[in-house]
């Protein structure tokens, strides 16, 4: 069902405009909508659970009386919750029943009935009724028009306002009612079902039916009979008997709300999420906390803190205050929707050494292609080949730096092994170390010169392909497995 925006002023045009106050009292002072999961503050005011928790994050006081209190002092109001749900379910029907109907304008050409143009009931005359009563006692009402009324004499027409005689009033009786209420028929009470039946019907059929049903363990059939003059007790009891319609508890909304309130209790299945002081936590600890709850760890430190704080409000409002909590998947869906609209990561964040800074640095001179690649950077349509061509020089430089680090690590490990030998071995290791240092200096000079030459070109080499870059990566992998220092 679609959610419709309603206001308390809808009742001002009804026959009971004072219901405007009731409708206003059942609304939250913060969101102006009907209370959802209402909670009670220590100062006695009621708000939506999520609304007041969000307000307390900014200002630790009541929005109405400014009384200061903590979030842990909020208490659930199950009764108010069911009252509001019951009221909202019948609000539209109540409005329809209380709306004052607008007077419909009467057309000018339409005649308004007056005393001279009132409706008439035509009754048959005494001579005609004698012949009709022999066959049927039913009342004959004949629809008459103005032409037929003109032909008839006024003595044969009786106005509706006139009082009929005893003989005419007797004509209103139905023949079916006469058959069922014969005054001379003797009635008797069944000793099994305690119901009154005609004596002949009781002796012939009813007693056998009651005895048969009683032997089978079934309840006897109770048939309704018309009261007769021979059974005054039955007549008086049926006159004052009031039919009370049975209430279907499954279809009546009020009954279900009452049952939910009577069976309400605090659920111990989910524990309350605590407030966390993030000032003493590192960024890795914050990520670990979010990962334990199944939340995203993207964004800056401040983004992750805001994400946890909002999820804590959703969790406690749902599992600690609501009678009908939703599952965790729905809470995470609500968090994702909030994260997209309220917790955006700034595009111009300068993370030192990060991929965003590198992408901005390399976008000079090729901004159009860079922006085109950046549009699909985080989905399956990302052009990897174009990305490798754009940043080919950086990949090559990183590969060379990795090779140099592998050489440095292998020389350090061989030097530590050589220290365990005698003095000659130490001198040999030191000479080898000096040779390696000289070689590293030469390699670094070579890398610097290559970077300088590549910077002067300012364009990637068109002859190199993705296969060349892949071969360099494979060579680096083999080089890391079997470095030259191990030979």
UniProtKB/Swiss-Prot annotation:
EC number annotated for this UniProt entry: 2.3.2.27
Keyword Nucleus: yes
Reactions catalysed: S-ubiquitinyl-[E2 ubiquitin-conjugating enzyme]-L-cysteine + [acceptor protein]-L-lysine = [E2 ubiquitin-conjugating enzyme]-L-cysteine + N(6)-ubiquitinyl-[acceptor protein]-L-lysine
CDD domains: RING-HC_ScRAD18-like (cd23148)
SUPFAM superfamilies: RING/U-box
Keyword Disulfide bond attributed: no
GO cellular component: chromatin; nucleus; Rad6-Rad18 complex
Pfam families: SAP, zf-C3HC4_2
Bias type Basic and acidic residues, positions: 243-254, 421-430, 439-455, 468-481
Alphabetical list of SMART domains matching this protein: RING, SAP, ZnF_Rad18
Matches recorded under PROSITE patterns: SAP, ZF_RING_1, ZF_RING_2, ZF_UBZ4
Residue intervals of the SAP domain: 278-312
Binding site for Zn(2+): 190, 193, 206, 210
Region (Disordered): 222-254, 407-487
Further remarks about this protein from its record: Present with 206 molecules/cell in log phase SD medium.
Function of the protein: E3 RING-finger protein, member of the UBC2/RAD6 epistasis group. Associates to the E2 ubiquitin conjugating enzyme UBC2/RAD6 to form the UBC2-RAD18 ubiquitin ligase complex involved in postreplicative repair (PRR) of damaged DNA. The UBC2-RAD18 complex cooperates with RAD5 and the UBC13-MMS2 dimer to attach mono-ubiquitin chains on 'Lys-164' of POL30, which is necessary for PRR. The UBC2-RAD18 complex is also involved in prevention of spontaneous mutations caused by 7,8-dihydro-8-oxoguanine.
Binding partners and assembly: Homodimer. Interacts with E2 UBC2, forming a complex with ubiquitin ligase activity. The UBC2-RAD18 complex interacts itself with the UBC13-MMS2 ubiquitin ligase complex through direct interactions of both RAD18 and UBC13 with RAD5. Also interacts with UBC9. Binds single strand DNA.
Record-stated family: Belongs to the RAD18 family.
Listed name of the protein: Postreplication repair E3 ubiquitin-protein ligase RAD18
The organism's taxonomic lineage, starting at the top: Eukaryota, Fungi, Dikarya, Ascomycota, Saccharomycotina
């Amino acid at each position: 069902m679609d959610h419709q925006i309603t206001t308390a002023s809808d009742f001002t045009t009804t026959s009971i405009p004072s219901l405007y106050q009731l409708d206003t009292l059942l609304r939250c002072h913060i969101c102006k909508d009907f209370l959802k999961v209402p909670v009670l503050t220590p100062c006695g005011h009621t708000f939506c659970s999520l609304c007041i928790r969000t307000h307390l994050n900014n200002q630790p006081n009541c929005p109405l009386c400014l009384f200061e209190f903590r979030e842990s002092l909020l208490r659930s109001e199950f009764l108010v919750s069911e009252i509001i749900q019951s009221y909202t379910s019948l609000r539209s029907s109540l409005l329809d029943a209380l709306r004052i109907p607008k007077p419909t304008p009467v057309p000018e050409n339409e005649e308004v009935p007056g005393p001279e143009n009132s409706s008439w009931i035509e009754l048959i005359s005494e001579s005609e009724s004698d012949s009709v009563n022999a066959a049927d006692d039913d009342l004959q009402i004949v629809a008459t028009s103005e032409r037929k009324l003109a032909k008839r004499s006024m003595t044969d027409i009786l106005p509706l306002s006139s009082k009929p005689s005893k003989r005419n009033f007797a004509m209103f009786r139905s023949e079916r009612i006469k058959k069922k209420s014969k005054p001379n028929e003797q009635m008797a009470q069944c000793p099994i079902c305690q119901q009154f039946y005609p004596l002949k019907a009781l002796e012939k059929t009813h007693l056998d039916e009651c005895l048969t049903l009683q032997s089978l363990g079934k309840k006897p059939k109770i048939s309704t009979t018309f009261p007769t003059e021979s059974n005054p007790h039955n007549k008086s009891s049926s006159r004052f008997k009031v039919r009370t319609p049975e209430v279907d508890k499954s279809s009546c909304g009020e009954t279900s709300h009452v049952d939910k309130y009577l069976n309400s209790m605090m659920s111990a299945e989910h524990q309350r999420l605590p407030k966390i002081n993030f000032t003493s936590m590192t960024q890795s600890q914050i990520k670990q906390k979010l990962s334990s709850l199944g939340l995203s760890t993207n964004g800056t430190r401040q983004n992750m803190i805001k994400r946890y704080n909002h999820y804590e409000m959703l969790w406690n409002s749902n599992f600690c205050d609501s009678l009908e909590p939703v599952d965790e998947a729905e809470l995470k869906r609500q968090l994702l929707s909030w994260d997209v609209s309220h917790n955006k990561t700034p595009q111009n964040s300068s993370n030192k050494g990060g991929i965003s800074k590198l992408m901005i640095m390399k976008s000079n001179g090729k901004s159009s292609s860079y922006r085109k690649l950046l549009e699909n950077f985080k989905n399956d349509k990302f052009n990897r080949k174009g990305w490798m061509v754009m940043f080919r020089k950086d990949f090559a430089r990183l590969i060379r730096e990795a090779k140099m680090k592998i050489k440095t690590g292998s020389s350090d490990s061989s030097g530590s092994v050589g220290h365990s030998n005698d003095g000659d071995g130490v001198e040999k290791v030191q000479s080898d170390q000096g040779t390696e240092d000289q070689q590293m200096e030469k390699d670094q000079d070579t890398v610097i010169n290559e970077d300088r030459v590549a910077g002067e070109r300012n364009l990637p080499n068109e002859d190199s392909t993705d296969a060349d870059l892949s071969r360099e990566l494979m060579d680096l992998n083999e080089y890391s497995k079997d470095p030259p220092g191990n030979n």
